[in-house]
Swiss-Prot record:
Protein name (Swiss-Prot/TrEMBL): Coiled-coil domain-containing protein 126
Keywords on record: Glycoprotein, Secreted, Signal
Taxon lineage: Eukaryota, Metazoa, Chordata, Craniata, Vertebrata
Gene Ontology CC annotations of this record: extracellular region; membrane
Keyword Nucleus attached: no
């Protein structure tokens, strides 16, 4: 009889301890969630990129206006610089798209392997390999 009373008491103490621990954990999680600085949204980042690109193009145009048409090489240098900048940006976008595509393929393959409720056997989604191409080497 003593053991049954002791077990109830221990069970209540353990449940109270777990409840307090869960409450503290939840409060700490909320605290750290709201204390962390907010990440900039993709819309704001896109606007910043477009603004910086416009400034860069304006600066190149003004630089070309300031150079008198003594020689055609100055305007071609600005054009080549702009072309290189665009090539670097496109290469970065391509690399990010390849990474994103690989992540999506990984999720699709793992999701279809885990979903066996439809009765089909085997993996119907083809596993893609790394499709990364070196674009920066081909653009000059």
């Amino acid at each position: 009889m003593f053991f049954t009373i002791s077990r109830k008491n221990m069970s209540q103490k353990l449940s109270l301890l777990l409840l307090v621990f869960g409450l503290i954990w939840g409060l700490m999680l909320l605290h750290y969630t709201f204390q962390q600085p907010r990440h900039q949204s993709s819309v704001k980042l896109r606007e910043q990129i477009l603004d910086l690109s416009k400034r860069y193009v304006k600066a190149l145009a003004e630089e070309n206006k300031n150079t008198v048409d003594v020689e055609n090489g100055a305007s071609m240098a600005g054009y080549a610089d702009l072309k290189r900048t665009i090539a670097v940006l496109l290469d970065d976008i391509l690399q990010r798209l390849v990474k994103l595509e690989n992540k999506v393929d990984y999720i699709v393959v793992n999701g279809s392997a885990a979903n066996t409720t439809n009765g089909t056997s085997g993996n119907l989604v083809p596993v893609t390999t790394n499709k990364r191409t070196n674009v920066s080497g081909s653009i000059r």
